[in-house]
């Protein structure tokens, strides 16, 4: 993993423990005397902030492990206790704060990924597998304790000095932080910067003698000097960016305003209420980078002004109206937090006027002002149904180069974080037609697709679709529905079309209509048009002459590119990838040229019928959109290598 990919993944891992803070803040706030006056509720919220480093250790360990494992989370806690308790025996002054939790969480996650399946000798077998993970993590963290016991004190001094410099720099320091914070948003590295500012810099000791580090911790612990890294975000997120949204709406041609109005309104309301601004920011970041640079400068100015005015405000989640109301009467909030609203109104007009002028002056392609080809949004991109989500996930896989190019899938609140074989194969236009705000290509293997609040659900569905079978790359510039191939045309409708490919059945068995396949991706023809067969024999053959371009590692599916350019996917059974190759044996290797009827796979059909979810096997043309029609020829029983299955008609 390259360094940029590491920090991108770390940013995602930090999302889980950070997600706990809004709940803690609500409990802490509502338990205060001026609201519910229920101390045990306030203490419940305070407990989260008091043990934040431990929560980071558990959350990061779970997120970093390859399957969000509970044993990794336990190992994170074990590692944290071992390292922190051992370090202070070397130097009692050591305090790593949440960094200790992050480091031990990373160690625990890495140990799980490497040794969760370890086999030990019989007399130690009880400690093998996942039980080995907390033990090994504790050992490694003990070594880290010995190292950090001597290495960390100068680092701690440097952090303390750096924090003091930024704090002593006052308004200038907070302004620099705000500017850099926005510039790092496209890479996702802002989460790392935020963690240092919000959970590490600064120190406050309460009446009970408990020490708190970081702007957020100190603010909710009652430190009246906290908030310099938070206050200035409120005018930007609640007012400035909605002003930018209005400017982009009015800059769009009147005929296109209805198309972009709903989208801009929804992201503006989200920014105002919750402070989640990335969906709005990414609308103009990629289309008009100059505007984003202007936005970063204005954010720095806002933090500068807020600090210069002595405003101390804080948030548990982000600088939206909800957090503003919750923190307004907190002990740490300054008496002049109302000035943030005045600043907000000013920034609303500043953003509106500057964005309006710059968009028109440089003819920037903000939403609604793009070329006509960019206006097309596929139907499934607006679907909230389960089927629509599956189609959308399949389409994104195709847009990033298909399963051949997609190597790893992660997601955070607003973006898909993907590792690909070659970012040059990613179809930016196809992603935008699906509703993505933009695509960030961090390097040749690391990309981010900005999809908004549904990122995690889309990412999870993408993982499911990938396990079901291969998805071909999207065409270079498709002109309509990217994911769903047109239904097969009736024979009489294509009577004059030339047959470019004739396929024989690759399997002996019974024909099943594609719509009856117990898998939405195939049944909806998102993967391609074709037919399915329920096998009654063990041998799978090539349905046409061509090249076997891909055989999955588990040998349950293969892709054949015919001599005439048709891309045929033969997928044996549904969810058979979960069998990890059991029941399948490949008879040829990738890159082999084959003739129609030549054996490709051998199956243990008895085993598969007993263990697979279904052995109904789709045979689809993944690039069926390149042809005018697909004419089904087979029905009833078919014989592998002999019975004609379907014909593909040219345009």
Swiss-Prot record:
* Modification sites for Phosphocysteine: 412
Instruction: List the membrane topology term(s).
Output: Multi-pass membrane protein
MF terms in GO: kinase activity; metal ion binding; N-acetylglucosamine transmembrane transporter activity; protein-N(pi)-phosphohistidine--N-acetyl-D-glucosamine phosphotransferase activity; protein-N(PI)-phosphohistidine-sugar phosphotransferase activity; protein-phosphocysteine-sugar phosphotransferase activity
Q: Where are the transmembrane segments?
A: 16-36, 40-60, 70-90, 92-112, 132-152, 165-185, 192-212, 232-252, 264-284, 285-305, 308-328, 339-359
Q: Where is this site: Important for phospho-donor activity?
A: 556
Q: Catalytic site residues? A: 412, 571
> Which residue spans adopt a coiled-coil conformation according to this UniProt entry?
none
Q: Which cofactor does it need?
A: Zn(2+)
Compartments where located: Cell inner membrane
Q: Which positions are annotated as binding Zn(2+)?
A: 556, 571
This entry's Enzyme Commission designation comes to 2.7.1.193
Q: Its GO CC terms?
A: organelle inner membrane; plasma membrane
Residues with Phosphohistidine modification: 571
**One of the GO BP terms on file:** phosphoenolpyruvate-dependent sugar phosphotransferase system
Function, as annotated, reads: The phosphoenolpyruvate-dependent sugar phosphotransferase system (sugar PTS), a major carbohydrate active transport system, catalyzes the phosphorylation of incoming sugar substrates concomitantly with their translocation across the cell membrane. This system is involved in N-acetylglucosamine transport.
The written remark on domains in the entry is: The PTS EIIC type-1 domain forms the PTS system translocation channel and contains the specific substrate-binding site. The PTS EIIB type-1 domain is phosphorylated by phospho-EIIA on a cysteinyl residue. Then, it transfers the phosphoryl group to the sugar substrate concomitantly with the sugar uptake processed by the PTS EIIC type-1 domain.
The name under which this protein is listed is PTS system N-acetylglucosamine-specific EIICBA component
Q: Which organism is it from?
A: Klebsiella pneumoniae
Q: Which gene encodes it?
A: nagE
